[in-house]
Amino acid sequence: MATSNERKPAIFLLSLGCSKNTVDSERLTAQAVASGLTFTDDVDEASIILINTCGFIEDAKKESIDEMLAAIGKKEEGIVREVYVMGCLVELYRKELSEEMPEVDGWFGTRQLPDVLAAIGAHYCEELYDRRELLTPPHYAFLKISEGCNRRCSFCSIPKIRGPYVSQPIEQLLREAALLQEQGVRELNLIAQDISVYGYDLYGKPALNDLTLRLSDMGFDWIRLLYAYPLNFPLEVIDTMRQRRNVCNYLDMPLQHINDRILKSMQRGIGRKGTEELIDAIRQKNPDIRLRTTMIAGYPSETREEFDELLDFVRQARFDRLGCFPYRHEEHAPAYALEDTISDKEKEERVGELMELQESIAASLNRKLEGQTLTVLIDRIEDNVAYGRTEYDAPEVDNDVIIEIGDEAVEEGEFRQVTVEDSTAYELFGRVGSECS
């Protein structure tokens, strides 16, 4: 039975993909709320479904398409009135999608915020651009410091999707950060497709360290740096981590591979020697830093010997956090011109082999934390168990600290001292102590 849409003028927003997409969705939500619109977490209580898609890899594309089809189904059942789709997948396939899914009421790319708002009955206001309605827990947020990318990594379609690199001015980012602080944000995670070159286009020099210092002065409890590119990385940021208590001793720097031939084909602009020298310099400047990286296994023509070289490198480098993904042959990426020579089965086996190695490294590193007392930010509480993170763990991807809280008064979003009693490769188990001031 069709439901009366007039009685529920709410929007169901589904934000897929990365944290950069999350920020886009938060900006949109803030503008829509300022125009008097409401949002609901229950799709059956909505009159409009709005999907912010991801188009980075095949699995993400499939998820986005599946969600579109589900939304169309809700429209055909009379549960919702309109369906709109925005984001990265639309940038790549707008024509094909609109032909295949005429039931969708509007398609919008990554740079069409005013148009999306107009379609759902809201008004775009430039003065509200810095405002966001958080989709994360209220104690942490992502600060997107730039748009787009000027790198030309062969496996990546982001420059085609997001356009050229554009830094956001420092003063604008400080205003946005101040608004987030007013909302109760304690942990600020700096993100971009490439944070390493932040500021070059605006100031003619690297400005990541200047931005980090200014944000540190604002008094956030934690400031975290994510998605650094190894080429042209500004090492002075590592000095700032060591000197400023509220700048986390943590860096996410995807390396993708270590073999020189593969790195050259990937168009990374840096080889093994430069990569190893950079890692050594970072660790010498800040021995307490935790490094997270990402690798790709099964890149076109990667030989067994080249993959073994990657394994040996990871074994020696002992990264604190590491993710590995099988190479995906994406039609909008430059490497699509190469022959995808390695079977999916072999790719998955290589990923498994590398992650098994990393699991043993992570387990060994975590065992060394047993008996130590660490500062932990409590993310959530479920069934009398608290889940949190140390400064060495980014939201959603790194270690959980799991705490049986018993009769302790523990709240989400607070910092507590936790003594680690046990561990696995990706979890720490502890007991809670005092609240941090």
From Swiss-Prot:
Binds 2 [4Fe-4S] clusters. One cluster is coordinated with 3 cysteines and an exchangeable S-adenosyl-L-methionine. GO terms for cellular component: cytosol. It is found in: Cytoplasm. Residues 9-125 form the MTTase N-terminal domain. Its cofactor is [4Fe-4S] cluster. GO terms for biological process: tRNA modification. InterPro entries: Elp3/MiaA/NifB-like_rSAM, Methylthiotransferase, Methylthiotransferase_CS, Methylthiotransferase_N, Methylthiotransferase_N_sf, NA-bd_OB-fold, Ribosomal_uS12_MeSTrfase_RimO, rSAM. Residues 135-364 form the Radical SAM core domain. GO terms for molecular function: 4 iron, 4 sulfur cluster binding; aspartic acid methylthiotransferase activity; metal ion binding; protein methylthiotransferase activity. [4Fe-4S] cluster 1 binds at C18, C54, C88. It holds the Pfam family TRAM_2. [4Fe-4S] cluster 2 binds at C149, C153, C156. It catalyses: L-aspartate(89)-[ribosomal protein uS12]-hydrogen + (sulfur carrier)-SH + AH2 + 2 S-adenosyl-L-methionine = 3-methylsulfanyl-L-aspartate(89)-[ribosomal protein uS12]-hydrogen + (sulfur carrier)-H + 5'-deoxyadenosine + L-methionine + A + S-adenosyl-L-homocysteine + 2 H(+). Its EC number is 2.8.4.4. Keywords: 4Fe-4S, Cytoplasm, Iron, Iron-sulfur, Metal-binding, S-adenosyl-L-methionine, Transferase. Residues 367-434 form the TRAM domain. Its main location: cytoplasm. Belongs to the methylthiotransferase family. RimO subfamily. This is Ribosomal protein uS12 methylthiotransferase RimO. The gene is rimO.
